[in-house]
Swiss-Prot record:
The keyword Transferase does not apply. PANTHER family: CYSTEINE PROTEASE FAMILY C1-RELATED. Residues 19-133 form a propeptide. It comes from Carica papaya. Cysteine proteinase with a high level of diversity in substrate specificity, an amino acid bearing a large hydrophobic side chain at the P2 position is preferred. The keyword Hydrolase applies. InterPro entries: Papain-like_cys_pep_sf (IPR038765), Pept_asp_AS (IPR025661), Pept_cys_AS (IPR000169), Pept_his_AS (IPR025660), Peptidase_C1A (IPR013128), Peptidase_C1A_C (IPR000668), Peptidase_C1A_papain-like (IPR039417), Prot_inhib_I29 (IPR013201). Repressed by the active-site-directed cysteine protease inhibitor E64 (L-trans-epoxysuccinyl-leucylamide-(4-guanido)-butane) produced by Aspergillus japonicus. Inhibited by the inhibitor of cysteine proteases from Trypanosoma brucei (TbICP, rhodesain) and Colocasia esculenta cv. Kaohsiung no. 1 (CeCPI, tarocystatin). Repressed by leupeptin, a peptidic cysteine, serine and threonine protease inhibitor. It comes from the Eukaryota. This is Papain.
């Protein structure tokens, strides 16, 4: 892709106006690109405007819009170069396509508190894949145990979203009822975690086992930490009976747990490929410095299915498949580092 020089503000505004008037306000559910889009400023601006429309992007002034357009161009160049490598995954113009990687890391990762595991909880030892008899495929979405993908926004509350996915799953499995529960309640009330500055999924799960949790529509998500309002919301909607830890650094143990219910997991999500992930089986590049909590809701012969909390404008409609079976005890992106699930009798 040839580098296209920065353009003047006046020219940018003129082209934007021309492109905007010509846009079809149809379905932009997938904003893709072709090699022709990379050949001129006008085509790039048209692509940018289509992407803005899809993701409801509004900038405060023309200077910010030009700034975001320049980042968008750089990310598109990176996406195009990466996708030509024929990896098992591909990148795309997702909701984060106008953000630099440094900005993305600051806003959307780093929300797992330093002590992301605990010695308070025991685990059942599972030595390897051959020690357990589990299905080849598991997808808790197909079994009606997973609610729609949520969006945590710029609050570092991934730990609460991760915990809630597992609570919703086990309640469905035990009772037959799928309900949405309150991430905001965990954000407000878990005093061992740090609100929007990070937290512990295991601590959130212990809170629900000790007290309970309200429905999401009773205690809706606000994206900021406030005081704990559980008493104001009336009786709890659900309660679990405990928390278990999955044996760390053991793929077989994690698969065994996922086969029984959705599981809270952590991983390293700060890389540019993770930021711009569009689909396929992700293999990295990434390390083991876990900085984000998600939920494992299934697996296949060569991947683990992850539900994220960045909305449906990222990944495979809010999901990512992470490569498994690599022989790395940490797992790709540190996925086997720290995993927990709620107990419901």
């Amino acid at each position: 892709m040839a580098m296209i020089p920065s353009i003047s503000k006046l020219l940018f505004v003129a082209i934007c106006l021309f492109v905007y008037m010509g846009l079809s306000f149809g379905d932009f559910s997938i904003v893709g690109y072709s090699q022709n889009d990379l050949t001129s400023t006008e085509r790039l601006i048209q692509l940018f405007e289509s992407w803005m429309l899809k993701h409801n992007k509004i900038y405060k002034n023309i200077d910010e819009k030009i700034y975001r357009f320049e980042i968008f161009k750089d990310n598109l160049k990176y996406i195009d170069e990466t996708n030509k490598k024929n990896n098992s995954y591909w990148l795309g113009l997702n909701v984060f396509a106008d953000m630099s990687n440094d900005e993305f890391k600051e806003k959307y990762t780093g929300s797992i508190a330093g002590n992301y595991t605990t010695t308070e909880l025991s685990y059942e030892e599972v030595l390897n894949d051959g020690d357990v008899n589990i299905p080849e495929y598991v997808d808790w979405r197909q079994k009606g145990a997973v609610t729609p993908v949520k969006n945590q926004g710029s609050c570092g509350s991934c730990w609460a979203f991760s915990a809630v996915v597992t609570i919703e799953g086990i309640i469905k499995i035990r009772t037959g009822n799928l309900n949405e529960y309150s991430e905001q309640e965990l954000l407000d009330c878990d005093r061992r975690s740090y609100g929007c500055n990070g937290g512990y999924p295991w601590s959130a799960l212990q809170l629900v086992a000790q007290y309970g949790i309200h429905y999401r529509n009773t205690y809706p998500y606000e994206g900021v930490q406030r005081y704990c309002r559980s008493r104001e919301k009336g009786p709890y909607a659900a309660k679990t009976d405990g928390v278990r830890q999955v044996q760390p650094y053991n793929e077989g143990a994690l698969l065994y747990s996922i086969a029984n219910q959705p599981v809270s997991v952590v991983l390293e999500a700060a890389g540019k490929d993770f930021q711009l992930y569009r689909g396929g089986i992700f293999v990295g590049p990434c390390g083991n410095k876990v900085d984000h909590a998600v939920a494992a809701v299934g697996y296949g012969p060569n991947y683990i299915l992850i539900k994220n909390s960045w909305g449906t404008g990222w990944g495979e409609n809010g999901y990512i498949r992470i490569k498994r079976g690599t022989g790395n005890s940490y797992g790709v992106c540190g996925l086997y580092t720290s995993s927990f699930y709620p107990v419901k009798n």
